[in-house]
């Protein structure tokens, strides 16, 4: 749990907003450094399947929490990848650092919280500005339930 200061002009209540996230595992090594561990499954383990998490909001959030919980004794984030296809294997390594992204991530959270406050109380989901993304609008399991509504509007 982290309390993040609100942006100037944010209409939400209080001086901070709550940001929560759940880690798979949090450990301390023999030198006393704290690590946040996340488990991921994959059909292949390559350097690109590791690097894709470097700028992921989930992992940037882990770094925010790790720094808050452990301070200078934060070791980082460990990704424990388990290969599902034969031959089965696993790979455990620390995530590449992204210090600028971690700094910017807090600002992104503030911006999102400000946007949520701005549009709170609207009647329907279509009263919000849409977010257009091939990752959101049409995922690997098919289109979002509002895909056609975003395409054509409410006719």
Where are these regions (language model features)?
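Amphipathic alpha-helical segments in well-structured domains
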Residues: 55-59
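Metal-dependent nuclease catalytic regions and adjoining charged, substrate-binding loops involved
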Residues: 8, 49-54, 64-155
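Catalytic cores of nuclease domains that cleave nucleic-acid phosphodiester backbones
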Residues: 1-45, 70-76
């Amino acid at each position: 749990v982290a309390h993040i200061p609100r942006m100037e002009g944010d209409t939400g209540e209080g001086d901070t907003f709550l940001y929560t996230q759940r880690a798979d595992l949090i450990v301390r090594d023999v030198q006393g450094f704290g690590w946040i561990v996340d488990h991921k499954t994959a059909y292949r383990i390559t350097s690109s399947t590791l690097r894709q998490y470097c700028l992921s909001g989930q992992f940037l959030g882990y770094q925010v929490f790790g720094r808050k919980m452990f301070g200078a004794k934060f070791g980082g984030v460990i990704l424990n990848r388990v290969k599902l296809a034969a031959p089965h294997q696993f790979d455990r390594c620390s995530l590449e650092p992204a210090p600028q992204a971690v700094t910017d991530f807090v600002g992104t959270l503030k911006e999102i919280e400000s946007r949520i406050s701005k549009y709170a109380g609207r009647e329907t989901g279509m009263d919000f500005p849409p977010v257009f993304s091939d990752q959101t609008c049409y995922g690997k399991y098919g289109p979002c339930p509002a895909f056609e509504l975003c395409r054509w509007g409410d006719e």
